[in-house]
Amino acid sequence: MTIFQSEKQIVMNFYRRLDAAPTDQIGTILQSTVSDDYIWRGFHPFNEIRGGEAVATCFWSPLKAALTSMQRRMDIFFAGMNRLEGDDSVWVVSMGHLTGLFDQAWLGIQPTGKMVMLPYCEFNRVADNKIIETAMYFDIPHLMMQAGLQPFPTQTGAHMIQPGPMNHDGLLFAPQQAEEGDRTMASINAMITDLGQWDSGLPLEDELRRTWHENMCWWGPAGIGATCSIERYAKQHSGPFRAAFSDRSQTQHQCRLAEGHYGGFFGWPNFTATLSGHFMGMPATGLSGEFRVIDIYRREADKLAENWIFIDMLHFWKMQGLDLLKQNEETPHT
């Protein structure tokens, strides 16, 4: 059985140092932890950054300065080998919230002086005792809504702070049985095969039941929201989403892995599609857009029971001609 304890320890040691560091030491910590050719990918407006010092300057130092007493509250932590064909790289996954007192403006979002929780999920590729590559996805519109802004007209699901797994067993610090990870990966792959191209020929709810638990929970991003049960997921997200888009490209992932009952993937982007109908209260544009997505899953028996989703909505809507961060900065606030 292949275990990934050393890679997990490298990431956990990095988190401990990063989370405790003052802003003027973050660059030094990253430089000692990441490789010389380190690549970091994050949601708009950060996009792709190269080098530990640049990541510290552009992302971590401003964020930690904005969130006084910032804490990392992890709900899920696991590791594994990339299951995509021809790739045996090892990745460590962390998901939860970065929480603190919103005391300084960030990305033009004005501070509230109150506690906020920024949902995040991070994939770290580890090799030769260094972090080589990171995909760090975080829900900026969710933070905007916590600060009293309304970046989107409406959403089909419920707006809430995403909880961790129902079983509270998502922190896989100890080694897991390889067979359980294989079962989780098989469930995820079956779902991708069924849903990836929207062409199974089955009624939507019947299609979903092939791979999803009847009482599944879907923790969607701000602008779409959360829902539960196959019937309500079909009504409040999957159905409206499919109806809004056409010309969906094939799915492309950078990494796909599983350990124990947990697994997930990310892409850059995962797929493209044309906005040919109404979506998130916005009209059709006829323009193609990229979907940069992280999906994390919890398996129960052989069905997917929970799904946490991070979508770069700011990037997608910017491709549709709507720069939500710029719009916020140009709007007078009282």
What residues fall within each predicted segment?
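C-terminal and inter-domain tail/linker signature
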Residues: M1-T334
